Amino acid sequence: MEYTTLIARLKNASESFVNLEMQLADPDIANNPKKLESIARERAKLEPLVLDFNQLLDTDKEIGDSKQLLKENRNDKDMESLINEELFSLEDLKNQLIEKLTIALLPKDPRDERSVMLEIRAGAGGNEACIWAGDLARMYERYGQKIGWTVKPISASESDMGGFKELVISVKGDSVYSQLKFEAGVHRVQRVPATESQGRVHTSTATVAVMPEADPVEVKIDPTEIEIGTARSGGAGGQNVNKVETAIDLIHKPTGIRVFCTQERSQLQNRERAMEILRAKLYEIQLKEANAKERSQRLMQVGSGDRSEKIRTYNFKDNRTTDHRLGSNFALEPILAGQLDDVIYACLAQEQKRMLEDFNENEN
């Protein structure tokens, strides 16, 4: 991006920021909580950009002042050396800010702000794969709780030996998809199962699909294409469990997608949850079709985001987690405890670097 173009766009953003601050001071808006929240959210998004822009302007001014000072001290070699050293640092800072601001102005994935449905399925490895699926679910639950998201299981198929054959988790909060989209794919574990008497290491897998929540307007579902059955829920619920059919078994006939929802206490709530899951699954199909038609506009994920792509290996013997997209290793225990920030931010940095390279290629 040309420097003059960058500055022009940043000035527009700065003007928008000032305008939003003026609106926040407006008594009429202050009396409208919904509008106030919307404006405050927009202001919060722009604030880091404006702060970096102001730092860029300050750095530019310091560079100009240093160059003028250099002209005035041509005969003083010691002073000239000090000024050149300062100029080198300032130019380096300026280049860093330009790259950071250029990335910030690149087109965003419109789904980044959304909440998601996480679908975790046991893969190869039998009962151990089901246990591993449960471990992954707890990892994401801990990560979400640390950030302040609302994490809730909404559909589960438990294994007889523990863990889950399949589990769908609702994760609600700000910008959930922007972070969890990097978790889509195959997660492989290498460890000695509790049931292994010979101490042999087994390899098991679980697949994770990250589905941004879809608005009913985006995904229209024909009621005539849905087959709904009911069943008695199992699990917590006291005497109500086996007497009332609260579970919902939903089938979308055109795609064959089946959703079995038991987590809520009423049939109506389970039906609503089942429809949310179905809508997210259909939305994911739409996204994949769009991405297949236009490769340059893929899911903006590191790798393909395909649930069949192996993205990470968790090695218990060596206490090591390897992210295959990054080619980097991380300590195992903190990752399983929900401390995913380092790996997610590394994936984000890799994504931003690739986006910047693509942008520069298109500019040339």
Curated annotation (Swiss-Prot):
One of its GO terms (cellular component) is cytoplasm. The keyword Protein biosynthesis applies. Methylated by PrmC. Methylation increases the termination efficiency of RF1. It is found in: Cytoplasm. Keywords: Cytoplasm, Methylation, Protein biosynthesis. It comes from the Bacteria. One of its GO terms (molecular function) is translation release factor activity, codon specific. The modification N5-methylglutamine is found at Q239. PROSITE patterns: RF_PROK_I. HAMAP family: Rel_fac_1. NCBIfam families: prfA, PRK00591.1. Peptide chain release factor 1 directs the termination of translation in response to the peptide chain termination codons UAG and UAA. Belongs to the prokaryotic/mitochondrial release factor family. This is Peptide chain release factor 1.
